Regions:
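N-terminal glycine-/serine-/threonine-rich phosphate-binding loop
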Residues: 1-51, 55-65, 74
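Ligand-binding beta-strand-loop-alpha-helix segment within the catalytic cores
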Residues: 63-105
Length: 105
């Protein structure tokens, strides 16, 4: 029998709108994902990054306002940065939860 495949899509604000909210949300999400993994499912995760990309874009543009040697960051760069840090938070939360449960796969 083949494993059950589960796709999890974390929507627009599922991971919060601030860094502390995201930290808490990724830990809570990791628990649910670990439950699925323990049950034998193959899990694929997709996530939105709208609040996070907005925070990064604002921060980068504010930083560059009074500095002639810095240009404003394009939205595509900010999006890549936010995808990386959201993925990093999810990865760390899921890894920690699985290790806590003794799941090593």
């Amino acid at each position: 029998m083949s494993k059950k495949k589960v796709v999890i899509a974390l929507g627009h604000r599922a991971l919060g709108t601030t860094m502390p909210e995201q930290y808490k949300a990724t830990r809570n999400t990791a628990k649910a994902i670990a439950d699925l993994v323990e049950a034998g499912a193959d899990v694929v995760i997709s996530h939105s990054n709208a609040p996070q990309v907005g925070m990064i874009h604002t921060a980068m543009n504010e930083f560059s306002k009074d500095r002639e040697d810095y240009t404003q960051a394009p939205m595509s760069v900010c999006s890549a940065m936010s995808q990386g840090y959201v993925g990093y938070d999810l990865q760390n939360a899921i890894r920690a939860e699985l290790l806590k449960r003794g799941v090593y796969r």
